[in-house]
């Protein structure tokens, strides 16, 4: 039986070829990227400093980690920059080597893809439309008692937009800590949330060693081609082991430099949040 191919939102060339379309006639909704585009300040800085590509980046990414530290209000030692969140997902799964994984879904397919290389079983905890795709935390905990050692969730979740509050996350991660379950939380979309502090798990990395939070610049900062992601965990031993497995200089010099500019561009951050939140309200009204 013939099956249609499945495309990622970035596979524009493949889509054009398969459907015989022109690139300029495609309106992209699959990548969820900030409609404002790249920060003008970052764009100018990249153009003015492109010569840094002639030098290797700092292997420790010290300046970038310090910038992320200020941006997230977390110690720089907790931070591991990488070649997009995809590299960090892969490194985390390789190092953790889970046997039985539970994923909150529907969600981003890359988690499942990386797990398929690890030998871990994987099962979805399906969020229900009847409950506005909000997870039932007590029920989720009961499910986790069935032999799982790894939990993956995206918060806010893509594509449902549902979010788990920080207090609910604290209870969930605490339960997982008692059961020796490691938790990976993908916060790729957290900057789009109305109240970031109400749902981010980053502060919880100070409390729990069975937690890693992933973020990046692909969506909110409209820079998916930069391939800059970062992981945050208070588990220093685990972080060191991930770093040992990471390819040296996996993030290029220009990406590391531009990441610092973007994360410090408060005007762009404010403009983006104002646009997204006001447009969200307008869409709901209309």
Kindly give the residue locations of the regions a language model identified:
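Helix C-cap/helix->beta junction micro-motif
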Residues: 118, 178-179, 208
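Active-site phosphate-binding strand-loop segment of PLP-dependent enzymes
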Residues: 131-193
